[in-house]
From Swiss-Prot:
ATP 1 binds at G13, G117, N118, R119, G120, M121, G122, A123, S131, T132. ATP 2 binds at G164, D197, G261, S262, H263, G264, R265, G266, G267, S275, V276, S277. There is a cross-link at K109 (Isoglutamyl lysine isopeptide (Lys-Gln) (interchain with Q-Cter in protein Pup)). Keywords: ATP-binding, Isopeptide bond, Nucleotide-binding, Ubl conjugation. The keyword Ubl conjugation applies. GO terms for molecular function: ATP binding. This is Universal stress protein MSMEG_3950/MSMEI_3859. Pfam families: Usp (PF00582).
Length: 294
């Protein structure tokens, strides 16, 4: 079983947007699966002006606080509508007044995972929450889940969990979370290894067949111990020759959750988000869990 922080449980950033509501719905179901608390957090970003603050500033701050209360109340209603009024889940709420990204990154250290919508924050949402999501994917502690609206596949309990494996230490950590998620959902796990990311240029050295065999051996090595720990999870092993991000995005269409490491082959400790993980997190319609180290 995956060890996790417990103060915040499943931490979800809320802001009253439709994308935020979708993230709350996903987080509520996730908290129920883990029997964990859910924390609804709204962060009031500092107001930056290029002229001296006048009497109007008090009105601006009051409006921000009112919006924050509304965002929390709306998120609480979403949880109740999703799980029922008598769900029994511990719902915690918190309003902070700091940098949005910095606050959520700091809070991630005390959370089992952080869940965010792919955009939000009103009219400028794509800029603001887009940058917040990106910052979390680069710097948060532990898993970050990006929810892309109310994708129906995310609610289809029959679909498998998709795991991207590349043999890196980061994908090993992702493997533990993928097995745990599949086990809790009672679904299969598709373990996908894509073994070429340089196009269709014939390699100098091992043949395609040898490369494929190496990929299968890598999958077997990475999965052996985990299959023993989670005998209830049926694993489908897939080895493909293609662009990794493209193939993961294609397979994601038939999955309820995609799990990837924060960076892949050749990554250094502390390296920023890998290009494959970044593209999948940005482009998939299925919820994507990017597992970062703690």
């Amino acid at each position: 079983m995956v060890q996790s922080a417990t103060e915040y449980g499943i931490l979800v950033g809320v802001d009253s947007s439709a994308e935020s509501d979708a993230a709350v719905r996903w987080a509520a179901r996730e908290a129920s699966l883990h029997d964990a608390p859910i924390t609804l957090m709204h962060v009031i970003a500092p107001v930056v002006v290029s002229w001296p603050a006048g009497p109007y500033m008090a009105t601006v701050l009051e409006c921000q606080e009112e919006n924050a209360r509304h965002a929390i109340e709306q998120a609480q209603k979403v949880v109740a509508d999703c799980l029922g009024e008598t769900h029994g889940l511990t719902v915690q709420t918190e309003i902070r007044k700091e940098s949005v990204a910095r606050t959520l990154i700091d809070a991630s250290k005390s959370a089992q995972m952080v869940v965010v919508g792919n955009r939000g924050m009103g009219a400028l949402g794509r800029v603001l929450l887009g940058s917040t999501s990106t910052s979390l994917l680069h710097y948060a502690s532990g898993p970050v889940v990006v929810v892309h609206g109310d994708d129906q596949a995310a609610h289809d309990s029959r679909l498998p969990v998709l795991l991207g494996i590349d043999g890196s230490p980061a994908s090993e950590v992702a493997t533990s979370h993928a097995f745990d998620e599949a086990s809790r959902r009672g679904v299969d796990l598709v373990a996908l290894h894509v073994w070429i990311d340089v196009g269709d240029i014939p390699p100098i050295g091992p043949t395609w067949e040898e490369q494929e065999e190496t990929g299968r051996a890598l999958l077997a090595e990475r999965l052996a111990g985990w299959q023993e720990r989670y005998p209830d999870v049926k694993v489908h092993r897939r080895v493909e020759r293609a662009q990794p991000a493209y193939w993961l995005l294609e397979e994601a269409k038939q999955a309820q959750l995609v799990v990837v490491g924060s960076h892949g082959r050749g990554g250094f400790t502390g390296m920023l988000l890998g290009s494959v993980s970044s593209r999948v997190a940005q482009s998939a319609t299925t919820p994507v869990m990017v597992v970062r180290p703690r």
